Swiss-Prot record:
Pfam families: Exonuc_VII_S. It comes from Agrobacterium fabrum (strain C58 / ATCC 33970) (Agrobacterium tumefaciens (strain C58)). Its EC number is 3.1.11.6. Bidirectionally degrades single-stranded DNA into large acid-insoluble oligonucleotides, which are then degraded further into small acid-soluble oligonucleotides. GO terms for biological process: DNA catabolic process. It comes from the Bacteria. One of its GO terms (cellular component) is cytosol. Heterooligomer composed of large and small subunits. This is Exodeoxyribonuclease 7 small subunit. The gene is xseB.
Amino acid sequence: MNMTENANTADVSGYSFEKAVAELESIVARLERGDVALDESIAIYERGEALKKHCETLLNAAEKRIEKIRLDRAGKPQGVEPLDGE
C-alpha cells in the first residue's frame, strides 16, 4: 500500500476507535521494518500522528461517559456519578 500525501491528509474523524488503531498499528509495523523511503516515512508518520490524536479524542470522550455506581450505607446501589467525581 503506497501512502500518498492525499492519504496522509485524509480525514480520520469518522473512523471508529478500532479502525484507527488498526491503521496505526499497520503504520508502526511499516516504520519499524525500515523498508520505506524517507519521504514516505514522513508522510505515514504524519498520518499516524493524526490517527493517534483521533484515538486520544475518542478515549477522552469515552472516559467522560464512564460512571461509577454510588452505594448507600447498606452497600446497595444508590445511583451513579461521574468516575472522576465531577
